């Protein structure tokens, strides 16, 4: 999904591959979950290949991430895509990868994350908050080759042991963004946790129409 100057639209990968879409008029793109290519080649590997090995698609995406007026979010499969394309820490000589959960199985669960001090456009105002959220992935482990201070970690699982940390991610990482704070990746599905009735547990004394996660998307719209 992409959000342009006059609203939102579906921006299909095939349009980028064919050169029909260049992202020039787009300011916000979301790469979302969905087990692209059925994960036959590994998580988001086939999806990433469509960008890596197609000149038109690669140019469109590279130009988008080079611009200073853009935002993006990669959720689950989209997180795996942005990490596979090395878009979050482009200056690193060794890049983090998304690898198999330590449990060696797919994990679908309701857990919680604690938002760290961060400069993320979408989540900086959440600093110190602990919020419930769904996860659903088989390759959700952030395998990070450098020390923690080399990464802009936005959110961590509230507890570092399984099953609260469902994948064994290095530094308990659940969410990360680039140095500018404009490009966010998250394995937890914040978009599946928008409504209180999405949550496995929601405080009964609260009568919210939306969960706090909606604010992240509101902030992205305000920014652009």
Model-identified regions with their sequence ranges:
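Short conserved micro-motifs on helix faces and helix-strand junctions that flank
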Residues: 4, 68, 73-74, 134, ...
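Composition-driven recognition of long, C-terminal low-complexity regions enriched in serine/threonine
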Residues: 4, 49-52, 183
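Amide-donor transfer/coupling interface in amidating biosynthetic enzymes
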Residues: 18-21, 25, 58-65, 95-221
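Short, glycine/serine-rich, charged loops/turns that create anion-binding
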Residues: 77-79, 190-191
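Single conserved hydrophobic/aromatic residue that forms the stacking wall/gate
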Residues: 1-12, 222-223
